[in-house]
Amino acid sequence: MGWLNLEQKVAIVTGGASGIGRAICEGFAEVGVRVAVADVNGEGARQTADELRDKFGGEHIATTTDVTNKASVDAMAQAVLDAFGRLDILVNNAGINIPRLLVDPAGNEELTEKIWDRVASVNQKGVFLCAQAAARVMIKAGGGVIINMASECGMEGSEGQSVYAGTKAAVYALTRSWAKELGKYKVRVVGIAPGILEATALRSDEYERALAYTRGITVKELRERYKKATIPLRRSGRLSEVADVVCFLASDRSSYIHGTVINVSGGKSRA
């Protein structure tokens, strides 16, 4: 057994077909976890599950899951129970970001009610529905771990992405609240707040252009400023570094970590 003792555990990773989620799936598979790759992109989820089996061996499945739809989330949980008979870990990773300014005097598209509802539905409602479905299974089984994906901007705010920051701030509160509710059932609830990463869905070209625009600088200048001026380690994070923290938090090596959100930001965020 490895140091983490995660062999044969079963984990759901939402948003697992790409970006941080895919890196987490790979990190889990490498240490022997059986992974359910859940994603609204069903083909991407199936491809990821196939690649996990080819690269790491073991049993892995894919589910086409819309985290904003309760029936879809319940079907995801049932598919995992049908395949593995248990659920030990949920990683609430699925999330979206549609950057817009609240008001833009320059005439560019502003934040709209439709955008607000869409981002909040995935980033807040989705976290709630998946956590609820997983918690029901874990309570019956006598324990488990729920890991919620927050963000540094959930504590600090961020120009041009207020709705994203607001939904991620909610993840902090949900993590702490559910920890108080579920601890007595031996279900740990923790969070992770990544900072600036080398390549994720959240750090898209559109995002960088929008953020650079709000600061009146180029995208290249934006990247250099963030690395040199705001990150003490002077570099962006790697997806694998987030996955490593997830694996640790999912293991019994972190058995007394509960109700907190861990920053993975190279020192940029310290709250």
PLM regions: where:
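Short C-terminal tail/terminal secondary-structure segment
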Residues: 1-5, 97, 156, 235, ...
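Canonical Rossmann dinucleotide-binding motif of NAD(H)/NADP(H)-dependent dehydrogenases/reductases
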Residues: 3-36
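Short, small/polar-rich loop/turn modules that mediate ligand/substrate recognition or access, typified
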Residues: 86, 183, 188, 257-259
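Substrate-binding pocket helix/loop in short-chain dehydrogenase/reductase
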Residues: 101-117, 227
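Active-site helix of classical SDR
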Residues: 131, 167, 175
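Alpha-helical segment proximal to the catalytic Tyr-Lys
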Residues: 136, 179-181, 255
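Residue(s) in the substrate-gating loop at a strand-loop-helix junction
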Residues: 151
